[in-house]
């Protein structure tokens, strides 16, 4: 029994934002930015055992211009940070970022001058995925949570304001390396 049989007269009510969110969530094309051991777990997620294609993500994009999800897997060095930002800027709107692993989320065990202490100091992050490295099941769960977040995103001018506020808030936070004396 389908939805058409339940509603009288074939009427289906929704908003444009909900329909667009549903379509966007079902067709994510991730750009992989695998830098360390988390990339191995990300590759196994695309394998037949976990089958990431169930979520419309069977195509990993090699170019940022065709991707709308950046999965940052692993630590980001200070020299790699401008490259990461450039790749993020080349992605078309709408775009989302998933920080995979504790190194991408907070620098991990690499608390030194050469490693960015959280990729959120370079690009705005939508989903943080903890673990060292996180299991493929955790990545699939994070993708499901990202789908829920995408379906709630506004469109048009409201989306532009939400993106601008999120990016300014993420970049205004002091980096962990500046707080180094306070953490010990």
UniProtKB/Swiss-Prot annotation:
GO biological process: aerobic respiration; electron transport coupled proton transport
Topological category with respect to the lipid bilayer: Peripheral membrane protein
InterPro entries hit by this protein: NADH_UbQ_OxRdtase-like_20kDa, NADH_UQ_OxRdtase_20Kd_su
One of the Pfam families matching this protein, by short name: Oxidored_q6
Localization per record: Cell membrane
Listed transmembrane segments: none
SUPFAM superfamilies: HydA/Nqo6-like (SSF56770)
GO cellular component terms listed in the entry, alphabetical order: plasma membrane; respiratory chain complex I
Gene3D superfamilies linked to this entry: 3.40.50.12280
Catalysed reaction, written as an equation: a quinone + NADH + 5 H(+)(in) = a quinol + NAD(+) + 4 H(+)(out)
PROSITE patterns in the cross-refs: COMPLEX1_20K (PS01150)
Note on how the cofactor is bound: Binds 1 [4Fe-4S] cluster.
Keywords: 4Fe-4S, Cell membrane, Iron, Iron-sulfur, Membrane, Metal-binding, NAD, Quinone, Translocase, Transport
GO MF annotation: an example: 4 iron, 4 sulfur cluster binding
Cofactor(s) listed: [4Fe-4S] cluster
Role according to the record: NDH-1 shuttles electrons from NADH, via FMN and iron-sulfur (Fe-S) centers, to quinones in the respiratory chain. The immediate electron acceptor for the enzyme in this species is believed to be a menaquinone. Couples the redox reaction to proton translocation (for every two electrons transferred, four hydrogen ions are translocated across the cytoplasmic membrane), and thus conserves the redox energy in a proton gradient.
Similarity field: Belongs to the complex I 20 kDa subunit family.
Subunit text: NDH-1 is composed of 14 different subunits. Subunits NuoB, C, D, E, F, and G constitute the peripheral sector of the complex.
UniProt xrefs under PANTHER family: NADH DEHYDROGENASE, NADH DEHYDROGENASE [UBIQUINONE] IRON-SULFUR PROTEIN 7, MITOCHONDRIAL
Protein name: NADH-quinone oxidoreductase subunit B
Phylogenetic classification of the source organism: Bacteria, Bacillati, Actinomycetota, Actinomycetes, Mycobacteriales
